[in-house]
Structure formats: structure tokens, C-alpha cells
Amino acid sequence: MAAKVFESIGKFGLALAVAGGVVNSALYNVDAGHRAVIFDRFRGVQDIVVGEGTHFLIPWVQKPIIFDCRSRPRNVPVITGSKDLQNVNITLRILFRPVASQLPRIFTSIGEDYDERVLPSITTEILKSVVARFDAGELITQRELVSRQVSDDLTERAATFGLILDDVSLTHLTFGKEFTEAVEAKQVAQQEAERARFVVEKAEQQKKAAIISAEGDSKAAELIANSLATAGDGLIELRKLEAAEDIAYQLSRSRNITYLPAGQSVLLQLPQ
């Protein structure tokens, strides 16, 4: 009797395990920010997109393919040529995501690794097309315009593959060694020219200052000569007295004691 009970329990447990396995294989989860495409072994890829949550499928007949529909970044480096045939190294940062409603078409025509297959190809195509419209110098001075044109053209091109580009930006822009050296040489030449112009302007200012000073000295000498011709020795004696007065004032303010001989003027040869 006991053996039959244990046998019944064993069969029930086995049936329960099989049923649990079947139920478990018939369930699948779609996480937040993801979508699922169903592949049917008899009918192929279903033209439906499954949203977030837990869902049922037919075990061994249907298979879910999960896609991440959140925005993801990708850097794409490209080497191309400018309008004046300069080599340009550009790195483009792209923030992309698939159009959820087009996931069945994306999976059928491109595959799960759609970003690896599509983004490098169309980025190279668009960058070569846009950069070829600008000279190397314009790529630097008009970088915002270049970035905007690349973004517009690339967004339109990606839409044909069912991709949305939330952001496109130029993160790296360098040129070949020859162009870089030429730019550095030009900057050095401009600095030398500015320095030479400053030296010339300084010399001109010094020359003008010297001319003004000489004219002032000449005018002063002329005025003194006229005064001497008019006043004679009286003007000279007046200037001596003014100088003596100034010297005496300075000596009176000094802490040192100065002794003067009686009856003589040692400051200036003034008349007695």
C-alpha cells in the first residue's frame, strides 16, 4: 500500500515538473525600454511588436527576439578629404534608437546587429559628402555649420533604415601633419608681423617725442635769448637770487648744520 502511495506521489511530482517546465517555456519577459519581435517556425517573423511585461508564446514554435529601444551612444571615426584635398580625421558621436514599429522590418532586412551594419556605413557616406564641400580652413571656422549639415543629412538617411538619431555632434576634428605644420607656421609669421609692427610704431612714437622735445628746447632757448637781449645781466642775477633762495630753504630744512664764512657767498658768486 505504501509503495503505491509513493509511486503515485512520484508520478504526480513528475507531471507537475513537466507542466511547470512547459509553462515556464511558454512565458517570456520584456524589460522596460525594450520591445520584442516574434519569430514563428512556420510563419516566419510576425508583423507585431510586443511591449513591456510578461507574455505567452508557443514553446518550440515561437521565439522572442528582444530589442533595446532606449537611446544609445556610438562613436564613429572617419578619415576623409576636404575641398582643398586635405586629409581630415573626424569622430562623430551619435545618439540613436530604433523605431519600435519598424522592428520586424529591421530584424528581417538587417538583423539584430543593425547598428553595426548601418551606422558606420551611412556615417562615412554622409561625412565624405559634407566635408568635401568645405576647405580645411572653413571646417574650423564654420564648424557649427558643418555639424548641422551632417546632422540633418545623417538623420534623414538613418530614417530610411528605421533609426531615430536623437543627437549628432562632431567630437574630434584634426588634419594631416602637413596642414597642421602650415597652420603653425602661419601663426608664427602673424605673430612676428605683429611684433615688427609694434616695434615700428614704438620707433615712430619715440621719433615724434624727440621732435617735440627738440622743438620745445629750441623755443625755450629762443625765449631765453630774447629775454637776455632785453633785460641784459639783470635777468641772470635774478635767476641767481632765486636759486640761492631755494638752496637756503633746502638747507634750513636739513638736519645737518652748515657753516658759512663771514662776508662771503659760497652758494653763488653774488655781488657783494
From Swiss-Prot:
Point out residues bearing the modification Phosphothreonine: T91
Q: What keywords are annotated for this sequence in UniProt?
A: Acetylation, Cell membrane, Coiled coil, Cytoplasm, DNA synthesis, Host-virus interaction, Membrane, Mitochondrion, Mitochondrion inner membrane, Nucleus, Phosphoprotein, Proto-oncogene
List the expressing tissues. Answer: Widely expressed in different tissues.
Indicate where this protein resides in the cell.
Answer: Mitochondrion inner membrane; Nucleus; Cytoplasm; Cell membrane
Question: Its quaternary structure?
Answer: The mitochondrial prohibitin complex consists of two subunits (PHB1 and PHB2), assembled into a membrane-associated ring-shaped supercomplex of approximately 1 mDa. Interacts with STOML2. Interacts with MAP1LC3B (membrane-bound form LC3-II); the interaction requires PHB2 and takes place upon Parkin-mediated mitochondrial damage. Interacts with STAT3 (unphosphorylated or phosphorylated at 'Ser-727'). Interacts with CLPB. Interacts with CD86 (via cytoplasmic domain); the interactions increases after priming with CD40. (Microbial infection) Interacts with SARS coronavirus/SARS-CoV nsp2 protein.
Assigned protein family = Belongs to the prohibitin family.
Q: What is this protein called?
A: Prohibitin 1
Specify the species: Homo sapiens (Human)
**Gene this protein is translated from:** PHB1
